[in-house]
């Protein structure tokens, strides 16, 4: 269950962050409406991923995903845009990921 859940979180992050990045590139960086359209499709696909999480609680899944989004956004920025996080960015992302573990995988 944990592996499936973690993989779904990664897929959700790639779709959401990637989709938002494509929209950004298409609109703000003037790369064209095809980029924007691809971003919208990726964002739409992201909307379905949470439904496949093993946990049945929507609020829990989306709250935990928020932590993955924070860390994933920093990683995406590093890879795609040359962003260099500082120690506070990294510390904040680590705190968020700890929150993911507590919210999703703590014994209940």
UniProtKB/Swiss-Prot annotation:
Transmembrane segments: 7-27, 32-52, 61-81, 87-107
InterPro entries: UPF0060 (IPR003844)
Membrane topology: Multi-pass membrane protein
Compartments reported by the entry: Cell membrane
A GO CC term attached to the entry: plasma membrane
Main localization (coarse): membrane
Pfam family, any one: UPF0060
UniProt entry keywords in alphabetical sequence: Cell membrane, Membrane, Transmembrane, Transmembrane helix
Protein origin, superkingdom: Bacteria
Family from the record: Belongs to the UPF0060 family.
HAMAP family attached to this UniProt entry: UPF0060 (MF_00010)
Name the UniProt record assigns to this protein: UPF0060 membrane protein Mflv_3127
Organism encoding this protein: Mycolicibacterium gilvum (strain PYR-GCK)
């Amino acid at each position: 269950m944990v592996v499936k859940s973690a993989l779904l979180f990664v897929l959700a992050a790639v779709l959401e962050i990637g989709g938002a990045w494509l929209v950004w590139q298409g609109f703000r960086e003037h790369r064209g409406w095809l980029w924007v359209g691809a971003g919208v499709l990726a964002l739409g696909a992201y909307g379905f991923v949470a439904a496949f999480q093993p946990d049945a609680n929507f609020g829990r899944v989306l709250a935990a995903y928020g932590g993955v989004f924070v860390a994933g956004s920093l990683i995406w920025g590093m890879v795609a845009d040359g962003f260099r996080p500082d120690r506070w960015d990294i510390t904040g992302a680590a705190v968020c990921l700890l929150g993911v573990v507590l919210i999703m995988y703590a014994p209940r």
